UniProtKB/Swiss-Prot annotation:
This is NADH-quinone oxidoreductase subunit H. The keyword Translocase applies. It is an enzyme of class 7 (translocase). NDH-1 shuttles electrons from NADH, via FMN and iron-sulfur (Fe-S) centers, to quinones in the respiratory chain. The immediate electron acceptor for the enzyme in this species is believed to be ubiquinone. Couples the redox reaction to proton translocation (for every two electrons transferred, four hydrogen ions are translocated across the cytoplasmic membrane), and thus conserves the redox energy in a proton gradient. This subunit may bind ubiquinone.
């Protein structure tokens, strides 16, 4: 058939890759909630969810059915349009953040030359969703949680971006595939160890995960900026948070641990194993660390993370200039 051209086939294959990768990310984010509950139960010497399916394997399905049939309630004096848009923006921005991550040499949704900048833009867009949710709910606890979340996210995004500049300087590109190819013989975590440490800390803070979950502190804010959400609107926030964890874990692998590079096994298997390891670390951090005060979180960011990030960037620049001579 004459209308089937090589360009059309390439477009269809690109769409297929995008759909497959994004569906896998959503599925991983959803199943991570079950894995987290089981592991936290193990660490806290209790069973965790184990009633639905073999070993609790169908607990996620039960939770989805329950959430689907929950009342989609909107507060009486809220801004209905913004209240509805907020979870959509949060979910979409976090899902699109994964689009620039190369899973294997030929599997990436969007191989952009400004890949890292695109991730930072999507992370910044998620802040608006939190602000919209807190302000439109017409609830003081929601607003306080949104203010905390926006201040924390904007602050730690500074360190998040600066911690990546050393990697960009070494690779000479913002393209994620170029950065992975630059690690064929030496992973970036060795020359950029302090950059990795600050990126990991900032990544946990941007995802609002324990111990940086002050915007959702149950003891203080009764669940923070999404206290008024129920049904599938809350589900979008809930799954979006875990998609953020998957994305940050995948970025740690891509930027600092060689991406898909590894011996014997296929590239996507290495990428999946490394990403699963860092997803597990998010759960271990939640199980083992206490929650500090909000002022301690902000003070730690500006007084510890920022100087460490700047020193790492200056040392990296000096080494690159010395090697160029």
């Amino acid at each position: 058939m004459s209308w089937i051209t090589p360009d059309l086939i390439e477009i269809l294959l690109s769409i297929l890759k995008a759909v497959v990768i994004l569906l896998v990310v959503v599925t991983c984010g959803a199943f991570m909630s079950f894995g987290e509950r089981r592991l936290l139960g193990l660490f806290q010497n209790r069973y965790g969810p184990n009633r639905v399916g073999w070993g609790g394997s169908l607990q996620l399905v039960a939770d989805m059915i329950k959430m689907f049939f929950k009342e989609d309630w909107i507060p009486k004096f809220s801004d209905r349009v913004i209240f509805t848009l907020a979870p959509m923006i949060a979910f979409t921005s976090l899902l699109l953040s994964f689009a620039i991550v190369p899973v294997s040499p030929n599997w990436v949704v969007a191989d952009l030359n400004i890949g890292i900048l695109f991730f930072l833009m999507m992370a910044g867009l998620a802040v608006y969703a939190v602000l919209f949710a807190g302000w439109s709910s017409n609830n003081k606890y929601s607003l306080l949680g949104a203010m905390r979340a926006s201040a924390q996210t904007v602050s730690y995004e500074v360190f998040l971006g600066l911690s990546l500049m050393g990697v960009v300087a070494q690779a000479g590109s913002f393209n994620m595939t170029d950065i992975v190819n630059n690690q064929a013989h030496l992973w970036n975590v060795i020359p950029q160890f302090f950059g990795f440490v600050t990126f990991a800390i900032a990544g946990v803070a941007v995802c609002h995960r324990h111990p940086f979950d002050q915007p959702e502190a149950e003891q203080e804010l009764a669940d923070g900026y999404h206290i008024e959400y129920s049904g599938m609107k809350f589900g979008l926030f809930f799954v979006g948070e875990y998609i953020g964890i998957v994305t940050v874990s995948a970025l740690m692998v891509t930027l600092f641990f060689g991406g898909w590079h590894g011996p014997f096994l296929p590239p996507f298997v290495w990428f999946a194993l490394k990403t699963a390891f860092f997803m597990m670390m998010f759960i271990l951090i939640r199980a083992s660390l206490p929650r500090p005060r909000y002022d301690q979180v902000m003070s730690f960011g500006w007084k510890v993370c920022l100087p460490l990030t700047l020193i790492n960037l200056l040392v990296t620049a000096a080494v690159i200039l010395w090697q160029a001579q």
